[in-house]
Design a protein with these regions (language model features):
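Regions immediately C-terminal to embedded phosphopantetheine-bearing carrier domains
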Residues: 1-11, 520, 525, 565, ...
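Condensing-enzyme catalytic core of the thiolase-fold
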Residues: 2-433, 481
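Phosphopantetheine-attachment site and its flanking helix in carrier
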Residues: 15, 83-86, 305, 410, ...
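Flexible, low-complexity linker/boundary loops enriched in proline and small hydrophobic residues
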Residues: 18, 385, 401, 415, ...
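Flexible catalytic loop/linker elements that gate and position reactive groups at enzyme active sites
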Residues: 21-23, 42, 270-285, 295, ...
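Thiotemplate assembly-line natural product biosynthesis machinery
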Residues: 87-91, 613-642, 659-670, 691
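Phosphopantetheine carrier-protein modules
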Residues: 155-157, 633-655, 670-679
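Phosphopantetheinylated carrier protein domains
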Residues: 484, 640, 656-684, 697, ...
Length: 704
């Protein structure tokens, strides 16, 4: 057995979980997942859609859908990207928003992703589709590096593969990185998509697949695993930093430990001694007496070999010394959603973190008669099969989460309840919001449809919520959300009027008066609200001369200041939002971004493999103007027919090196010509490229 080394430091500073997002079977988001767990929901079912005819499992809906435009990814590249990358991009965006961090903030954030599956890469290679985007689309390293690149994260960026314990092993690395000061914030993720039947057959050949299609953790009926899929993302900060910033804390991570069996009966047979060792070390590092642990989220796969070993290891470390009437409660989310393999650990951790936050333990399913090979009473263990609330006198709570990889890498994480604190009482001075004082509430989206969807979601969130201070809502809208190109602002004095204007924005009935400064306003209503819409960078000369001129001055009161701040936001100008909303405002929880997803999938009917051969007959003739414009717009991911500055360099237009290769390849394929790798270097603007393709020297010849 491999000896453990203390890489994080015994009793190191706790780390706070300040943001979470997930997409699991039967649950499209964190709230849906908690509802599924509380009601004891079973999300196992037969394959459907792209997985039609597959054996029962925990499947995600609509894995082909993705909001490529938001992330600046062309449709062509999106189709060649592993859906696991796409899923992580969207969930990372939501996890940051949940942590009240603007997704465009960037900074010294580390990214640690657990994954052990490459089904889309397998599909790509089997189809012989080779393209400039194939490497970045399917290589596993880009599960982490894609996040770091898009979000502007400068901390460590790593993919961890320890099999089924990958996501908890990734969390262990994140803890070490935070405590060493390599990053100030960490994003930890786990992802698993079961896109082909090959993975099913591999597990079946190993003898680990449940023939009944249900996970029976620690039960007499245990007959193997049920595969599941999904992803979860956590945002972590040092606890002191999170408390100082006023962050919501779901729970704390007190410690983690990872080891390996280092031998045993076989490569895939778990070892009790190693599991006991990793448990002992985790609680030593956390400074927690194992007898005080309230609950452990099991690895709990429901296999005949694995469950008894795990039970005996738990009983030997955490059950010892407990009175018979206070056994350790255990359970497994695999009974709800299946075994998520590379994402299994993070699924169990999100369940446990939510349980600590709500102080309520959801039931574990499919446990009716104990496994005869597991002496639950003697080990002081009890499977928690009913929903139960933790009582106030049971805190502060400590829980554990286990995840064991096929091949012997074991991980255990110790979680603690968030510190209990009361919000600072209002002191002397201005209240958070003076009655009747106008407050700007901001919205933005990458498309008009996204903006309307955000308005509808926010109206639903605010409707009937008398407890929400408009200044808190406004501050959150200004500081915890990305400021995207399509913008709107509502200046309101009361929640009902704000909700009414948001509904008008959602329905597109808010008016369209356009000012010379580029903003659009429907005028100040009798209820004191004003609605502004527009885009950053709008110029007065771009507007029709018949439109109204600048608004007349309305004095120097708060209404003028609020409207001026709203107009500045709409036009992309800087604003001191803390000064606008005041020092008492605290960001409220807002709806998460409404992605505008479309289907993208690998096209295996045609090969995308490189330019035509040198002796190929030309397949295209005509003016290259439309060809270059259409291909460039498509590769940039812009709407068909979008304007393009022909004299701007391809770099300034947004083409990176991979996009440049894709453009050269597409032009070559369309024209039937063999083009040099330096094509866009030699002709760096669309106008230059069009002229080169038009010249007599290139027609009917190789273009070198």
């Amino acid at each position: 057995m491999t000896e453990l080394t203390d890489t994080t430091g015994a009793c190191g500073e706790p780390v706070a979980v300040v943001g979470m997002a997930c997409r699991f079977p039967g649950a499209d988001d964190l709230q849906g997942f908690w509802r599924l767990l509380r009601r004891g929901g079973d999300a196992i079912g037969p394959g459907a859609g792209l997985r039609e005819g597959r054996r029962p499992g925990g499947y995600l809906r609509d894995v082909e859908l993705f909001d490529a435009e938001l992330f600046g990814i062309s449709p062509h590249e999106a189709a060649l990207m592993d859906p696991q990358q796409r899923l992580l991009l969207e969930l990372c965006w939501h996890a940051l928003e949940d942590a009240r961090i603007a997704p465009t903030a960037g900074g010294a954030t580390g990214v640690f992703v657990g994954s052990c599956s490459d089904d889309y890469a397998l599909m790509s290679r089997m189809s012989a589709v080779v393209d400039p985007y194939s490497m970045t689309g399917t290589a596993r390293t880009f599960l982490a590096n894609r996040l770091s690149y898009f979000f502007g994260f400068t901390g460590p960026s790593a993919v961890v593969d320890t099999g089924q314990s990958s996501s908890l092993a990734a969390l262990d690395q994140a803890l070490g990185s935070l405590r060493r000061g390599e990053c100030s914030t960490a994003v930890v993720a786990g992802v698993q998509l079961n896109l082909t039947e090959t993975g099913d057959r591999l597990i079946e050949e190993l003898g680990a697949m449940s023939p009944t299609g249900r996970c029976h953790t620690f039960d007499r009926s245990a007959d193997g695993i049920v595969r599941g899929e999904g992803a979860g993302v956590l945002v972590l900060k040092p606890l002191d930093a999170a408390l100082a910033a006023g962050d919501r804390v779901y729970c704390t991570v007190l410690a983690a430990a990872v080891n390996n069996d280092g031998g045993g009966a076989s490569l895939t047979t778990p070892t009790q001694t190693a599991q006991q060792s990793v448990l002992t070390e985790a609680y030593r590092r956390a400074g927690v007496d194992p007898a005080e642990v309230a609950y452990v989220e099991l690895h709990g796969t429901g296999t005949k070999a694995g469950d008894p070993v795990e039970a005996r290891a738990l009983g030997g470390v955490l059950g010892r010394g407990r009175p018979a009437d206070r056994p350790l409660l255990v359970g497994s989310v695999k009974t709800n959603i299946g075994h998520l393999e590379g994402a299994a650990g993070i699924a169990g951790l999100i369940k446990t973190a939510a349980s600590l936050f709500h102080r309520e333990l959801p039931p574990t399913l499919n446990h009716r008669r104990p496994n005869p090979d597991i002496d639950l009473d003697g080990l002081r263990l009890r499977v928690s099969t009913r929903r139960r609330a933790w009582q106030p006198d049971e805190g502060p709570l400590v829980c554990g989460v286990s995840s064991f990889g096929l091949g012997g890498t074991n991980a255990h994480v110790v979680l603690g309840e968030a510190p209990r604190r009361e919000d600072a009482a209002a002191g002397p001075g201005e209240p958070a919001a003076a009655a009747g004082e106008p407050v700007p509430v901001l919205l933005s989206g990458h498309t008009d449809a996204a903006l309307r969807a955000q308005a509808a979601l926010l109206a639903d969130r605010l409707d009937g919520r008398d407890d929400l201070d408009l200044r808190d809502v406004g501050l959150a809208s200004a500081t915890t959300r990305a400021a995207l190109p399509v913008r709107a602002a509502v200046v309101a004095v009361a929640r009902p009027a704000l909700v009414a204007r948001l509904r008008e924005l959602a329905e597109g009935t808010h008016g369209d008066g356009t000012h010379a400064d580029g903003t659009r306003e429907d005028g100040t209503r009798e209820d004191g609200t004003t609605v502004l819409t527009g885009r950053p960078g709008a110029q007065p000369q771009d507007r029709p001369e018949t439109q109204p001129q600048d608004r007349p001055a309305r004095g120097d009161g708060p209404g003028t200041a609020a409207t001026a701040a709203a107009a500045a936001f709409v036009l992309g100008k800087p604003v001191d939002w803390l000064a606008v909303y005041g020092p008492r405002a605290r960001p409220a929880d807002l709806p998460l971004y409404a992605f505008q997803r479309r289907p993208y999938w690998l096209d295996t009917t045609t090969s995308a493999g490189g330019p035509a051969a040198e002796d190929a007959a030309p397949q295209w003739s005509g003016d290259p103007l439309d060809l270059v414009l259409d291909l460039t717009v498509q590769i940039l991911g812009r709407a068909p027919g979008a304007d393009l500055d022909l004299d701007a360099t391809f770099t300034d237009l947004g083409l990176d090196s991979r996009m440049a290769v894709a453009l050269r390849t597409s032009v070559a394929r369309a024209t039937g010509r063999v083009l040099p790798t330096t094509l866009l270097f030699d002709h760096p603007t669309p106008a230059a490229l069009i002229e080169a393709l038009r010249s007599d020297d290139t027609k009917g010849h190789e273009f070198r």
